[in-house]
């Protein structure tokens, strides 16, 4: 699933082709995604794109009349193509611009979503989201206070969008390994020092991943068709049975919160 770095990469990649230009029309080929594509999108014509942003794992296209909100789901990707580019299987939505470019959305598993809203502050899926991990609001004091008396595994805790947004399974594994924290350690038992290290490492790892275009494991591609190169930097995710890069002990794998977790039992203590 595309996580925060992948959505940020997608936003950065399409911005030069959308921002400041006009949407001529939106072509919806498959309205039945995870949620039905908002019918208002098919009615959009000659609307100027005024900005692009991201909230959690949602891509937001600002227009003069409202907001187009996209979620890439499990396997979605956006790319910039020309009008003569052939439509492939799973190309479900096109945003046709007046500059001769098309933002095309492809989603083999159809778990993504595209919405329209006139008021971003009242968009229901944003109502319970926690702070952005790269913002000043997300700091060690916040994380430590939020974790108090929480019996939840620390991995599930940092993946909870009500605590902090955008941290998926890949980056949660990497962050906990860098911090030397066992994924099953109760969040309520992390110390102030560990909360500070966790906050710092989350920010560092996400920033590094964004700089390298995210992580491509299977489906994700940048808007220019290139993979995300952070996959080459992964230390522990997907490396069951491989030697730990810190101590050489074999990396173990088990499930935490219904997600695959990778851990070095020597380096990551409960």
Curated annotation (Swiss-Prot):
- Cofactors demanded by this protein: Zn(2+)
Name the Enzyme Commission number(s) assigned to this protein: 3.2.2.23, 4.2.99.18
Please name the catalytic residues of this protein: 2 (schiff-base intermediate with dna), 3 (proton donor), 57 (proton donor), 259 (proton donor)
Entries under SMART domains matching the protein: Fapy_DNA_glyco, H2TH
Chain intervals annotated as zinc finger (FPG-type): 235-269
List the GO biological process terms.
base-excision repair
Q: Which residues form a coiled coil?
A: none
Record note on cofactor: Binds 1 zinc ion per subunit.
Any idea which GO molecular function terms this record carries?
8-oxo-7,8-dihydroguanine DNA N-glycosylase activity; class I DNA-(apurinic or apyrimidinic site) endonuclease activity; damaged DNA binding; zinc ion binding
Question: Can you name this protein?
Answer: Formamidopyrimidine-DNA glycosylase
Native source species: Actinobacillus succinogenes (strain ATCC 55618 / DSM 22257 / CCUG 43843 / 130Z)
């Amino acid at each position: 699933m595309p996580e925060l770095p992948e959505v940020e990469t997608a936003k950065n990649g399409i911005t030069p082709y959308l921002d400041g230009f006009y949407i001529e029309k939106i072509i919806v080929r498959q309205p039945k995604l995870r949620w039905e594509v908002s019918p208002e999108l098919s009615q959009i014509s000659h609307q100027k794109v005024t900005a692009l942003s991201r909230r959690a794992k949602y891509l937001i296209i600002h227009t003069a009349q409202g907001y187009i909100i996209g979620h890439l789901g499990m396997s979605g990707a956006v790319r910039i193509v020309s009008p003569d580019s052939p439509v492939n299987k799973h190309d479900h939505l096109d945003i046709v611009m007046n500059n001769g470019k098309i933002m095309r959305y492809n989603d083999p598993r159809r778990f993504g979503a595209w919405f329209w809203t006139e008021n971003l502050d009242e968009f229901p899926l944003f109502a319970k989201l926690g702070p952005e991990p790269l913002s000043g609001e997300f700091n060690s004091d916040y994380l430590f206070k939020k974790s108090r008396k929480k019996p939840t595994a620390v991995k599930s805790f940092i993946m909870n969008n009500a605590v902090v947004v955008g941290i998926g399974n890949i980056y949660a594994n990497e962050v906990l390994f860098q911090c030397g924290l066992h994924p099953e350690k109760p969040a309520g038992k992390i110390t102030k020092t560990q909360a500070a290290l966790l906050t710092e490492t989350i920010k560092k790892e996400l920033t590094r991943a964004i700089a390298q275009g995210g992580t491509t494991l299977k489906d994700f591609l940048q808007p220019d068709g290139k993979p995300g190169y952070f996959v080459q930097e992964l230390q522990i995710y997907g490396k069951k049975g491989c030697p730990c890069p810190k101590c050489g002990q074999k990396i173990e794998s088990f499930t935490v919160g219904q997600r695959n977790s990778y851990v070095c039992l020597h380096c990551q203590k409960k």
